[in-house]
Amino acid sequence: MYPADIEKDAVNWKDAQGQHVTAVRRNILVLGSGGREHALAWKLAQSDGAVVYIALGNAGTAQVGINVNIKLSDFKAIKDFCIKQEIHLVVVGPEQPLVDGIVDFFKEDADLRGVKIIGPDRRGAQLEGSKAYAKDFMEKYGVPTAKCFKVNKDNLDEGYKFLESVNAPYVLKADGLAAGKGVLILNDLQEAKKELGKMLDGKFGAASATVVIEEFLKGIEVSVFVLTDGEHYVLLPEAKDYKRIGDGDTGLNTGGMGAVSPVPFCTPDFLDKVEQRIVKPTLKGLKAEGIDYRGFIFLGLMNDNGNPYVIEYNVRMGDPETEAVMTRIEGDFADLLDACADGRLNEVHYAKSNKTAVTVMLVSGGYPEAYKKGMVMSGLDLLKDVVAFHAGTTFDADNNVVTSGGRVIAVTAHGESIEEARGVAYREAEKIRFEGVNYRHDIGLDLMKMQ
């Protein structure tokens, strides 16, 4: 997108009226390679003077920035790249580098002091990295959540007793990160006890050495996104995602098969409850713990008869929710993240579109179980009135776009209503072809009844 010999301190282009414009160049590095990172890069590339690099990126991010072949676990290589390319801002997409301490690495290295980074340090990332820690935090600071019991091999009998004390279904959560697969919801008590034993025996490796047993919360789930500089915050557009592989919320859990934003039941009254009961106590708690948190907080909430409860904290944006949310954020997103990193979010104007975004995720045949990779994709050049965010794509030797993951591409459309937006999204999704392509046909249908 940008030539290698681009001026070092400025970016030049013509605006919509053909006027020559010059802006201070801002080199931005987005870490990650999925649909979330494509959406972040897509939005950041619209900022004045932005030159966006993505590590590792995918076939879609190559259209909005420059892909860089650096592993997310190689902090030294990331540092060297930031220095060489004079990176101004780093945006961390996935949770693993945050839990592994990439923000601490940046803060502690004198050579990187001029580089801003969006995300919490290792302590802050424990809100997602350890469900037991998150539960203790919520209890300590009065954040509403489900009743729970933390169990390991030393108190297994007490864990069994807790299971017997609550009603089905039974919720078992691996304490640590388990690639989104560490939560089991079971209807049979004996099966729950059996699976609890398997988890403690290493079903999810070290992640399930401790298991959090939770009382099941009934209601409708919603994802609420907060951007905070530690003192101030803004609520980004909320979204509802669809976890199950099949229509009608049937079949296996996935990373997410689609999203809708905004969510009809997230009224001003409901969101005020979220702020007063959850966001403000969470930020107060982080400050009390001495955690300087500058980044995203993704609140996985349950709406139980108009009352919000926290199911989980995440310390980054959601996927596929980001693919819907980013299309509704107005203004210069890099300015917003700059202000976040600088501790001056209160000084920046933030606005969001009133239109509805619907995202439909196309996945590989067989996903979320075994699937093929390398399937040639077609129809991408036929798309109109949508943004297609690549999740699992790459280029083959002949420069064809091919599949490289279970979740392949997210098609996002806007409309005045859910019905209008989903109509466009599905119309365009049908144009994308590859062997085994699969997607849900009911994204947003449940919410249309509420709108």
Describe the predicted segments one by one.
Residues 275-297, 314-385, 396:
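Active-site "cap" helix and flanking loop/linker of ATP-utilizing ligase/carboxylase catalytic domains
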Residues 182-322:
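Internal nucleotide-binding/catalytic subdomain
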Residues 2-120:
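ATP-binding N-terminal substructure of ATP-dependent carboxylate-amine bond-forming enzymes
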Residues 393-398, 402-451:
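Generic C-terminus detector
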Residues 18, 29-30, 114-115, 129-211, ...:
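Active-site nucleotide/adenylate-binding loops and adjacent lid/helix of ATP-dependent enzymes
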Residues 77, 158-159, 191-194, 369-371, ...:
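Short, conserved charged micro-motifs
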Residues 20-23, 45-46, 60-62, 110, ...:
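Solvent-exposed alpha-helices and their adjacent loops that cap or buttress functional pockets
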